[in-house]
A protein has these predicted regions:
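Surface-exposed, glycine-biased beta-strand/turn segments
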Residues: 54-178
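Catalytic cores of peptidoglycan-degrading enzymes
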Residues: 123-240
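Cationic-aromatic interfacial patches
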Residues: 1-73
Length: 240
């Protein structure tokens, strides 16, 4: 083949040489999937012929027990937050949240066209205790439930937050739920997000290095106390 492209759960797969005979591509598995994800691969030959393959890719780790979804764990954390985050939203607030969600999605989509900017493994944004893991259930004020699509790190207001890897700052904003946010485009479809900051210390377009300070821990948005919520996206999917 002279050209290979793929698609997995609406996110492009960018193939690159692994060795003289094999190719590899980075992809993501949605949290609600059971035990595998389907990828569609097209191979174009020098003759102009195109072959299509539909691949079912199994998880590298054990799937949840029967009847338990990744998106809905067996137990959930019950949290108390400002009532404005759990009462019925007015139309203006709902529209704001949707605009902010679309901004985050657009950063993920644009990252698919950014070349890979990192060479080192991804690092933790803080060397502190993890207080909540990816995929755990959340119930706010006994009413609003959701899945926690990120990792929370303990921190006091004003403590530093560091970039997980090299990349370009794609978004700095103040969101209703996430508070003050910074999104970094690392290329090859990967974006990391840093939520609830008291003070972002970077601007859109800045190139940041792995371990560079990008902001300060805070308690903005829907929180119970100051901490860092760290998230990652691959294209349209929020990933662990």
């Amino acid at each position: 083949p002279i050209h290979i492209v793929g698609n997995g759960r609406s996110s492009p797969l960018h193939f690159r040489p692994l060795d003289g005979e094999r190719l590899q591509a980075l992809g993501a598995i949605p949290i609600e999937a059971s035990d595998s994800v389907v990828a569609q691969v097209l191979m174009e030959h020098q003759s102009g012929a195109v072959d299509s393959l539909r691949l079912s890719l199994k998880y590298p780790h054990q799937a949840p027990p029967a009847g338990q979804s990744r998106a809905r764990p067996a137990r959930a954390s019950r949290l108390r937050v400002d009532p404005k985050f759990t009462r019925r939203m007015d139309a203006e607030t709902e529209a704001r949240i949707e605009r902010e969600n679309e901004l985050a999605r657009s950063v993920g989509h644009k990252a698919q066209d950014t070349p890979q900017l990192w060479t080192e493994p991804f690092a933790r944004p803080r060397q502190s205790k993890v207080t909540s893991r990816f995929g755990t259930g959340r119930v706010f004020n006994g009413r609003v439930s959701s899945s926690h699509l990120g990792v929370d790190y303990r921190g006091a207001t004003g403590e530093p937050i560091y970039a997980a890897n090299r990349g370009v700052v794609a978004l700095v904003d103040s969101f209703f739920l996430a508070g003050n946010v910074v999104y970094i485009d690392h290329g090859d479809g990967i974006v990391t997000g840093y939520f609830h900051m008291s003070l972002p210390k970077v601007a859109v377009g800045d190139t940041v290095e792995r371990g560079q300070e990008i902001g300060l821990v805070g308690a903005t948005g829907r929180v119970t106390a100051a901490h860092l919520h760290w998230s990652a996206r691959f294209g349209a999917l929020t990933i662990d």
